[in-house]
């Protein structure tokens, strides 16, 4: 089976693969961040959002993987084999978990649309030859809040507002869940 854990969130393994492996913080840092920002929601019996659920699952998977690694470390006699298993877990599985944790924490923190826009922007930046791209990569926290990701195949509506409606003079605020609320 070829399962893409990002598909239901509008992203893909391929889209995240543009980010270099050293881009993602350590699992310890990501777990600390998730705990500091979302502990109450993650430990709650209530369903908060698909991102909270995915984050819970990634954290549980990492815990089980660490239990397995501990068991292997205790029960595998050959030091070379033990080192191979530890290395494989840290390099391959660790990267996948770091990507999952980063994606869902970022979506909860910045909003899914902003994270998707960042992934697309970074993917375009990294594939552009160095001579033709800006020297610095896009930064997630500096993307404008008005970022809109359009679905392929849909053309934007081209309509001016009717003269009867008055437009507010203040800029429109993007609807998103408050960072203060846990869910």
From Swiss-Prot:
GO cellular component: host cell; host cell cytoplasm; T=4 icosahedral viral capsid
Sorted UniProt keywords: Capsid protein, Cytoplasmic inwards viral transport, DNA-binding, Host cytoplasm, Host-virus interaction, Microtubular inwards viral transport, Phosphoprotein, Repeat, RNA-binding, T=4 icosahedral capsid protein, Viral penetration into host nucleus, Virion, Virus entry into host cell
Role according to the record: Self assembles to form an icosahedral capsid. Most capsids appear to be large particles with an icosahedral symmetry of T=4 and consist of 240 copies of capsid protein, though a fraction forms smaller T=3 particles consisting of 180 capsid proteins. Entering capsids are transported along microtubules to the nucleus. Phosphorylation of the capsid is thought to induce exposure of nuclear localization signal in the C-terminal portion of the capsid protein that allows binding to the nuclear pore complex via the importin (karyopherin-) alpha and beta.
Localisation per UniProt entry: Virion; Host cytoplasm
Subunit (UniProt): Homodimerizes, then multimerizes. Interacts with cytosol exposed regions of viral L glycoprotein present in the reticulum-to-Golgi compartment. Interacts with human FLNB. Phosphorylated form interacts with host importin alpha; this interaction depends on the exposure of the NLS, which itself depends upon genome maturation and/or phosphorylation of the capsid protein. Interacts with host NUP153.
Residue positions where Phosphoserine is found in the record: 155, 162, 170
Sequence repeats: 155-161, 162-169, 170-177
Chain segments carrying region Disordered: 136-183
Region (RNA binding): 177-183
Region (3 X 8 AA repeats of S-P-R-R-R-[PR]-S-Q): 155-177
SUPFAM superfamilies: Hepatitis B viral capsid (hbcag) (SSF47852)
GO biological process terms held by the UniProt record: microtubule-dependent intracellular transport of viral material towards nucleus; symbiont entry into host cell; viral penetration into host nucleus
Top-rank lineage group of the source organism: Viruses
Compositionally biased intervals (Basic residues): 149-176
Protein name per its UniProtKB record: Capsid protein
Family: Belongs to the orthohepadnavirus core antigen family.
Short name of one Pfam family: Hepatitis_core
PTM section of the record: Phosphorylated by host SRPK1, SRPK2, and maybe protein kinase C or GAPDH. Phosphorylation is critical for pregenomic RNA packaging. Protein kinase C phosphorylation is stimulated by HBx protein and may play a role in transport of the viral genome to the nucleus at the late step during the viral replication cycle.
Motif position, Bipartite nuclear localization signal: 158-175
Gene3D superfamilies in alphabetical order: Viral capsid, core domain supefamily, Hepatitis B virus
An example molecular function term from Gene Ontology annotations: structural molecule activity
Main location: virion
